[in-house]
Amino acid sequence: MKKTLLLNSVLSELIASLGHGDMVVIGDAGLPIPPETRRIDLALCRGIPPLLETVRVIASEMQVEKALIATETGQRSPHIRDGLGQLLPNTPFEEVSHEQLKALCRQARAVVRTGEYTPYANVILVAGVVF
């Protein structure tokens, strides 16, 4: 049995297979996921799992070079933006429009769907390198 924080085998495989610059989207329950993009659906019910907890666990194993969030996140859900900043304190953040974020989902290696019910609670984690 794994000793590290992340136990989900699908997420572990995804993170182990990432290359520099690959993107992983962690989204709320309502984020549209393009049919051609891999969907990893963790949503059990409203609020479970929450987005920030999901980011915390994924970031414990993923080298994150930068994070992208929608401008609307800070405007409509500042507690999500602040929480992401606390979880990823040394990670640069870039803001894009919500429409741009949705379009970037097509280029992502996967979209991880959470049970989050907060507007604009989505983040794209861009993989870095550990050397």
UniProtKB/Swiss-Prot annotation:
It is found in: Cytoplasm. Pfam families: RbsD_FucU (PF05025). One of its GO terms (cellular component) is cytosol. It is an enzyme of class 5 (isomerase). Gene3D superfamilies: RbsD-like domain. Pathway: Carbohydrate metabolism; D-ribose degradation; D-ribose 5-phosphate from beta-D-ribopyranose: step 1/2. Substrate binds at residues 28, 98, 120-122. Keywords: Carbohydrate metabolism, Cytoplasm, Isomerase. GO terms for molecular function: D-ribose pyranase activity; intramolecular lyase activity; monosaccharide binding. It catalyses: beta-D-ribopyranose = beta-D-ribofuranose. InterPro entries: D-ribose_pyranase (IPR023064), RbsD-like_sf (IPR023750), RbsD_FucU (IPR007721). Catalyzes the interconversion of beta-pyran and beta-furan forms of D-ribose. Homodecamer. Belongs to the RbsD / FucU family. RbsD subfamily. This is D-ribose pyranase. It comes from Chloroflexus aggregans (strain MD-66 / DSM 9485).
